């Protein structure tokens, strides 16, 4: 090689990357003239390398490697569905050799393998009333699920229904005509709100407020107990405070009255007082003028009471208003470096209480959630620093506050999971038709989240790890009830697959049937937990527990209708449903607020029995009363003992479990019989002697049998109920039979009551109908049993502060019955 060739090779240089790409001459400057002219970035990188050919047998090696990994995946999970691009190549089924029509069919088939058809459509349920109002419920609500149960029962019914035959031409049945549907909430416009209210005395108010803190405060932490009791003490002492705390105290008393049992002499007709406070807040409180944390607490308290009384639409409205106030105040952001320690902790608790309630109400109503998790930049709450020297804070509340915070944090985590999967399992949009398709990867993802939460739950929050009947045991059961209810909502779109074959040739459940089986197992677990709660003498009457049982019993009844071909399986489902109904009756028999939901469950079970064609013995109802402790109160009503505790069970009534109460021996026997879909009971009806007796938990002498829904009318409890009933057992133009007063030997009679069933309160608040005081000392429920310290026990001086009515017979000179003129009430 000559020296000229060597020098020529040395003069060869690398052009800049841009000139090399554009294949133009480069002057090799930094930057070059071309890059300067065109305003390019002049870079000198590594020279481009040509792609080399793959090594020999490289494709065969990848195929063997893929086959080995597929074998490992199938061994770990036989039901694992791998993506279509991992399938082995096949020349016959290659997309290249297929026509466009076959190619589109195969793509649809492969995409449908990863999607399951949901039980619900994307439309939900829109109810149009006669007055022009509309009420919409989404697919995740229990209203739509109950509509599906009705349609399935009517489809499988062996009993002819004249109403159904006459309406067979209509494609969409009227949900208000179903006798066992939960009635649609309505506005209480006919209720005239009070202009002024009377607050109870301080000791009585302290006991009532403590009921809320001891029952429901571990699931929603609304208040800071120390500051609340201090402001309450100053309010009663001076009578001067800001207007917001006045409404906050009224709202808290409204919630506290819902937990007052009838054994407590401190609350005469607590439900009437609660409703008066509720209407007072709705008519007098205006939150648009100012945004404070107290306003959020008031709206949240009113939303809780709306849930207690099954006003779901109003609860959704108040919760969204509270969430709007949180956005205006910036409670969803972390400002701990600006706020004080007390303000930061209170803002966290209030915001997450609103978040938990917003997730829950939006799910059970089926309406959109007003906040996304990506918008939340707020840390989880922590405990407050209590001052034990503060006499206004009950000592038991301090212990309850410290131990229940972990339950509240776990409740927040469950609410986050709930808000995530509702959008995936109950989609609003569907690309093809009205039927929704649920993605299998989305179901697997959220199923793993639920499983991870349950496996990592601390042992001291599981009922099997804590002492039985302890407060921690009750909290653990209630937390698991919340978890099982979320499982029911998660697996419910696949419940229609319960009738498909459960096992395939490999012995493992198929996916839709597996999800349906898990839904049924969660419902049975809820019944077991309710059975355990019914054994406890101090079970809190939470609306979370009632709605969990409500969803579980609907699921079990629906499973029983779907498995009619398998008698053993169907009988097992319906037996568990009856057991759960009796457990709910034992827990909520003293609460009037829950009578509407209990009535809906009872009518659902009766409708199933009326349409059942089996020969099983339905008279054998589950007996769980013998499992209660001896000291458990088995009262059946919240009406004071002065009034007769009468049920509407009679020997001539349509079901064999009815009986004639002793106090109504003089009852007329020619009262009209209730109707069933246009026919009376004396007409022939299949299996009319085989129905089980579903007793009413809260039935009063003025109640009517709610069997057939005709044209509906709104009542004061906010629900639509029929206005055409046959009075049982007395006509409403007569008085009720006499009863013996506990303070007089003279028989007295009730006056005829106005014609609306299940009015709240059950009797009007008047001095002639208030019970006599049992003693001069007023104590909170359970104070004598547990040794509850001050201020749960009312001092003897309290007898001069409580207003008692006069006796009906006019004898008001008893020393144990002070006159109402000496009462001191705070307005």
From Swiss-Prot:
Annotated GO CC locations: cytosol; nucleus
DNA-binding region: 16-42
Phosphoserine PTM positions: 112
UniProt feature coiled coil, ranges: none
GO biological process, one term: DNA-templated transcription
Keywords tagged on the record: Cytoplasm, DNA-binding, Metal-binding, Nucleus, Phosphoprotein, Transcription, Transcription regulation, Zinc
GO MF entries: DNA-binding transcription factor activity, RNA polymerase II-specific; RNA polymerase II cis-regulatory region sequence-specific DNA binding; sequence-specific DNA binding; zinc ion binding
Stretches the record annotates as Disordered: 80-114, 158-193, 794-827
CDD domains reported for this sequence: fungal_TF_MHR (cd12148), GAL4 (cd00067)
Biased composition range(s): Low complexity: 159-179, 811-827
UniProt xrefs under InterPro entries: Stress_Response_Reg, Transcription_factor_dom_fun, Zn2-C6_fun-type_DNA-bd_sf, Zn2Cys6_DnaBD
Subcellular locations according to the entry: Cytoplasm; Nucleus
Biased composition (Basic and acidic residues): 102-112
Family annotation (SUPFAM superfamilies): Zn2/Cys6 DNA-binding domain (SSF57701)
Family: Belongs to the ASG1 family.
Name of the protein in its database record: Putative transcriptional regulatory protein C16G5.16
Annotated organism of origin: Schizosaccharomyces pombe (strain 972 / ATCC 24843)
Taxonomic path: Eukaryota, Fungi, Dikarya, Ascomycota, Taphrinomycotina
């Amino acid at each position: 090689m000559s020296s000229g060739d060597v020098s020529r090779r040395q003069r060869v240089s690398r052009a800049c990357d841009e000139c090399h790409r554009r294949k133009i001459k480069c002057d090799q400057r930094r930057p070059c003239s071309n890059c300067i002219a065109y305003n390019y970035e002049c870079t000198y990188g590594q020279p481009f390398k040509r792609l080399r050919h793959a090594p020999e047998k490289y494709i065969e090696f990848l195929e063997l490697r893929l086959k080995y990994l597929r074998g490992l995946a199938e061994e770990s999970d036989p039901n694992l569905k791998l993506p279509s691009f991992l399938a082995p190549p096949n020349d016959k089924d290659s997309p290249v050799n297929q026509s466009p029509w076959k190619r589109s069919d195969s793509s649809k088939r492969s995409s449908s393998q990863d999607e399951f058809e949901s039980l619900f459509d994307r439309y939900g349920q829109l109810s149009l009333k006669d007055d022009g109002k509309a009420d919409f419920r989404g697919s995740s609500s229990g209203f739509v699920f109950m509509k599906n149960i009705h349609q399935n029962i009517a489809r499988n019914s062996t009993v002819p229904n004249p109403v159904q035959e006459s309406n067979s031409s209509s494609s969409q049945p009227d949900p208000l005509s179903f006798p066992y549907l939960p009635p649609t909430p309505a506005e209480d416009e006919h209720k005239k709100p009070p202009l002024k209210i009377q607050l109870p005395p301080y000791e009585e108010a302290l006991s009532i407020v403590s009921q809320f803190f001891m029952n429901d405060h571990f699931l929603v932490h609304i208040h800071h107990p120390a500051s609340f009791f201090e402001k309450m003490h100053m309010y009663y002492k001076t009578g001067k405070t800001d207007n917001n705390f006045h409404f906050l105290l009224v709202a808290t008393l409204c919630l506290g009255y819902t937990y007052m049992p009838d054994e407590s002499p401190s609350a005469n007709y607590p439900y009437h007082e609660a409703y008066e406070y509720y209407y007072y807040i709705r008519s007098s409180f205006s939150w648009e003028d100012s945004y404070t944390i107290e306003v959020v607490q008031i709206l949240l308290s009113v939303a809780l009471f709306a849930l207690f009384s099954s006003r779901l639409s109003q609860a959704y409205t108040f919760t969204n208003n509270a969430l709007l106030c949180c956005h205006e105040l910036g409670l969803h952001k972390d400002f701990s470096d600006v706020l004080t320690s007390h303000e930061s902790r209170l803002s966290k608790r209030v915001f997450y209480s609103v978040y938990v309630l917003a997730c829950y109400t939006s799910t059970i109503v089926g309406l959109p959630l007003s906040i996304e998790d990506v918008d939340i930049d707020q840390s989880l709450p922590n405990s407050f620093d209590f001052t034990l020297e503060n006499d206004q804070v009950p000592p038991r509340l301090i212990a309850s506050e410290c131990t229940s915070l972990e339950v509240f944090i776990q409740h927040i985590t469950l609410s986050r999971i709930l808000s995530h999967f509702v959008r995936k399992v109950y989609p609003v949009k569907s690309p093809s038709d009205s039927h929704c398709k649920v993605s299998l990867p989305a179901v697997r993802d959220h199923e793993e989240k639920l499983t991870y939460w349950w496996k990592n739950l601390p042992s001291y929050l599981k009922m099997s790890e804590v002492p039985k009947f302890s407060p921690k045991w009750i909290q653990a059961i209630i937390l698991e009830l919340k978890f099982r209810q979320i499982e029911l909502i998660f697996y419910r779109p696949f419940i229609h697959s319960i009738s498909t074959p459960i096992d395939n040739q490999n012995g493992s459940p198929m996916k839709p049937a597996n999800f349906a089986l898990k839904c049924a197992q969660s419902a049975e677990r809820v019944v077991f937990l309710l059975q355990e709660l019914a054994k406890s003498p101090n079970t809190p009457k939470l609306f979370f527990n009632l709605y969990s049982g409500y969803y579980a019993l609907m699921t079990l009844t629906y499973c029983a209708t779907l498995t009619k071909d398998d008698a053993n399986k169907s009988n097992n489902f319906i037996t568990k449903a009856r057991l759960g109904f009796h457990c709910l009756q034992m827990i909520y028999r003293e609460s009037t607020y829950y009578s509407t939901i209990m009535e809906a469950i009872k009518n659902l079970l009766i409708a199933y029995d009326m349409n059942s064609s089996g020969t099983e013995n339905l008279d054998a109802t589950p007996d769980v009363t013998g499992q209660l402790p001896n000291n458990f109160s088995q009262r059946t009503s919240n009406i004071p003992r002065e009034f007769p505790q009468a049920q509407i069970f009679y020997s001539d009534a349509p079901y064999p479990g009815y009986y004639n109460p002793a106090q109504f021996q003089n009852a007329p026997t020619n009262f009209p019989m209730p109707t069933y879909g246009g026919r009376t009971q004396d007409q022939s009806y299949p299996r009319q002697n085989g129905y089980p007796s579903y007793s009413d938990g809260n039935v009063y002498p003025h109640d009517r049998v709610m069997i057939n829904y005709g044209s509906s009318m709104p009542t004061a409890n906010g629900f639509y109920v029929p206005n055409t009933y046959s009075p049982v057992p007395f006509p409403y133009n007569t008085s009720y039979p006499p009863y013996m007063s506990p303070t007089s030997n003279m028989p007295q009679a009730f006056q005829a009551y106005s014609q609306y069933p299940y009015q709240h309160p059950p009797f009007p608040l008047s001095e002639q109908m208030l019970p006599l005081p049992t003693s001069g000392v007023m104590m909170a429920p359970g104070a004598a049993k547990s040794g509850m310290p001050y201020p749960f026990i009312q001092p003897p001086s309290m007898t001069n502060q409580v207003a008692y009515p006069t006796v009906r017979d006019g004898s008001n000179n008893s020393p144990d019955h002070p006159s109402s003129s000496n009462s001191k009430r705070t307005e």
